[in-house]
Amino acid sequence: FVAHGAPREILTDAHPHIGSNLLPNVVKAIRESILKAGGEIHFNARVEHLLRSADGRRVRGVACADGREFEANAVLLATGHSARDVYRMLLADGLVLEQKPFAVGVRIEHPQAFVDARQYHLNPGQKRPDQLPAARYSVTATIRDRGVHSFCMCPGGFIVPAATENDEVVVNGMSLARRDSPFANSGFVVSVHPEDTESFRRKHGVLAGVAYQKALETAACRAGGGMQKAPAQKVPDFLKGRVSSSLLPTSYHPGIVPHPLHELLPAEIVWRMREGMRMFDHKWRGFAGESAQLIGCETRTSSPVRIPRDERTLEHPGLEGLYPCGEGAGYAGGIVSAALDGRRCAEALAEQMQA
């Protein structure tokens, strides 16, 4: 990242951050390096089918929606956790997939000044010194065998829309390089295990977790009323099971509308979220107070599907030369872990090519 224009501070910071405003130029520079090294990048080339050898045992490339085919001795499948069409494609091609745990919930938003005051032990009315960065936090608990935790906390950040289809509302968080928004936000999520999606399994099989996510996302879209407006609720109202009569200012630009999130989310998610919020508020007075607001839904924390691979070769056990990789394959949970898994898969592929 640094070699392609990211701030050098990320090499030593405990919580490295590039900034969503700087990232496009970094990615552009990475793309240009790939091209200079002899690589090719094909935009608008959606893969619809895997090409196989005559005996069907080995991949020999990919076929795209526009009719183009790219032949290769190996395919590294690193499509991210929101490319749901890839899962359906693999199933149609007869490949085995597995369910895995994931997490769903909401974004919780506080004034950044509130987080600063707690983390830096400031006196009432005292502002954070300019020399200190916007403060961050992490909270976690286990409630009846399920994790309840913050996720992807964004100090001085924004809540942003992250849907991939028109009938969804999905929220995520981001921060610019300076982290100077007056808001702090974080995912606040509960673990979902395969057995929690049983009601979707009869119709959707191994994609039951995907269907579970999709049901929440379309419900959030209906609750928001369209145009990517999101359902929201003050935390005290969520805890008491009532609709908020008014909402707080927010960093979410498309807008928010009052809605009972305790009715939108599954009951087993709601009561664990409530228990977690009360627990964290006991340790950190105000965490679940009048300045805290929930915006839904946060559903894309990780993939609900794992694409199996051999522990040694990292190839899919049902198709030689296919290397499932990263978050979409279920082997990573963030930027750095996905990058490390990509490197691991590239090394395994290189070893096979040199054998």
Model-derived regions, located:
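Residues forming the flavin
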Residues: F1-A355
